[in-house]
Design a protein with these regions (language model features):
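Extracellular/periplasmic solute-recognition and catalytic clefts
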Residues: 1-53, 64, 72, 76-77, ...
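Sec-exported extracytoplasmic/periplasmic mature domains
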Residues: 6, 10, 30, 54, ...
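Active-site-proximal beta-strand/loop segments in catalytic clefts of secreted hydrolases
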Residues: 15-17, 39-41, 50-52, 77-81, ...
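Amphipathic coiled-coil alpha-helices
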Residues: 120, 243-246, 250, 264, ...
Length: 320
């Protein structure tokens, strides 16, 4: 890709996210014939859960899994140092995140901790062996359900083939010895991306999978209410009940902010993010830093990827 820019086949490459490509581009910039822009992505990569069936229907399990993944190391490894960890469905480039940066820092970051994971599971009732006796301290934990049956703490994960994020999740989460030590097991099934989307959009309780990994971007204006509308096919997390309704209501409140009242909108946005951070229907994995690389003959090209993107910026740029 960078070779095309270097040879002049193209004049600009935008939203480059691969760490190796970014480093190659920065080396080219040092030679003096190219320039670049860098900005945070208005989106993120995540683990997405089904919240209406299996162990992940229980918030404590979702919390425990977050505690069992070193997200800081994961993000740095995957992005090659050109990315960061966020605490909800947002990107660092969004103006709301800049306005509420201090408050966002105060949200639960789910810092890696086996002890915290175990406490969440114990508080959530995962305190039994398969036969109903008190958990012995090794093996799979079980939770007693309202119907008297015992549910094993086994999560079924569907991932797409040839996916570097999935590969990293295998080593950093699925095969992490602390996952077993916590009394949890994650089974991985690998298939096509088409198959992944089929299961991802299936919010029936018969769906055999509860965990997926993929990425999402956010539009401008930021509107996610449709993704959390109870009973909607767009509600891929299938977050239901009072918790799901509350999250949806917060998203609607954000959308109904009076036009031009940026302060009220940003406050409503943060209220949504804070509740989302507690419900945790998804685990944010990384938010990339995008880079645009372009010939030094291109002038006045300025974008931030969200408030003012490349489709706008190119209209005001000029070539020597």
């Amino acid at each position: 890709m960078m070779d095309q820019l270097k040879t002049g086949a193209v004049d600009i490459l935008y939203q480059v996210a691969d760490g190796d490509q970014i480093e190659q581009g920065l080396d080219m910039v040092e030679d003096g014939s190219f320039n670049y822009l860098s900005y945070g992505r208005a989106g993120y990569g995540m683990i997405s859960f089904k919240c209406n069936q299996g162990p992940t229907q229980f918030k404590e399990v979702r919390h425990a899994m977050a505690y069992l993944l070193d997200r800081v190391t994961f993000a740095q490894t995957f992005t090659g140092g050109h990315g960061t960890v966020v605490s909800g469905p947002y990107g660092t480039q969004q103006w709301m995140a800049e306005e509420y940066a201090e408050e966002l820092d105060g949200l639960n970051s789910y810092t890696y901790s086996l002890d915290s994971a175990v406490k969440e599971l114990e508080d959530g009732g995962w305190v039994y062996n398969e036969d109903g006796s008190d958990y012995s301290g090794s093996g799979i934990r079980y939770k007693k359900l309202d119907d008297g049956t015992y549910m094993p703490l086994v999560i079924e994960w569907f991932s797409s083939e040839n996916n570097s994020v999935s590969d990293l999740l295998v080593t950093s989460l699925q095969q992490n010895p602390d996952v077993e030590a916590a009394g949890m097991k994650i089974n991985q099934t690998v298939g096509t991306f088409t198959d992944l989307l089929t299961y991802y959009y299936d919010s029936s309780k018969e769906n055999p999978y509860q965990m997926f990994n993929l990425a999402s971007g956010f539009g401008n204006p930021y509107d996610v209410a449709y993704q959390y509308e109870p009973g909607s096919s767009n509600n891929t997390n299938a977050l239901e009940g009072e918790e799901g309704q509350k999250l949806y209501d917060l998203a609607i409140t954000m959308n109904h902010t009076e036009e031009g009242d940026d302060e009220a909108y940003a406050k409503a946005w943060f209220d949504f993010i804070a509740d989302w951070n507690d419900e945790l229907p998804e685990i944010p994995l990384y938010s990339n830093d995008y880079h645009d690389f372009f010939t030094s003959k291109l002038h006045d090209f300025e974008e931030d990827g969200y408030n003012w993107d490349a489709t706008n910026a190119i209209l005001y740029a000029n070539m020597e």
